[in-house]
Amino acid sequence: MQMLPTPLPRTGSALVASVPATAGARRVTLKLTMRYEMQCGWPGAGPLVVSLPAAMRVVPHSITRAAVSLDGKPPATVSVTGRVIVFTLPPRRGVTCMEIGPGALTVVFAPAAGIGNPAKAGTYRIAVRIGAHSFTARLTV
């Protein structure tokens, strides 16, 4: 009996945490981690789009590259339209392998990004998209 390879389903998960995690907190550190299949640990060409819920604040209405890290490095560009934040990822460098496997992309918004928690305690959805991958993370404050 011949065993044929079974393609893996496109799956992924996203987690989010805010420090402090209290309702109404201003200028929080917001950490998003997306886990999905990557080629050689590379998250993909992007763009990375993060859509914050209407209850969250982004003040000022722009975010500097220094106020955000993607896996510990600044994004190539950051743009903000309302509560939608779009990142261009730095270009991939070096040799590309052909291995597809589980990986993680972590986005950290520093307090300087000006993101504030919702005023009311509850659970809020943050939508994230990169390439063909879409995620929903739930922030509880």
Where are the regions a protein language model picked out?
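Ser/Thr/Pro/Gly-rich, low-complexity intrinsically disordered stalk/linker tracts of secreted
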Residues: 1-141
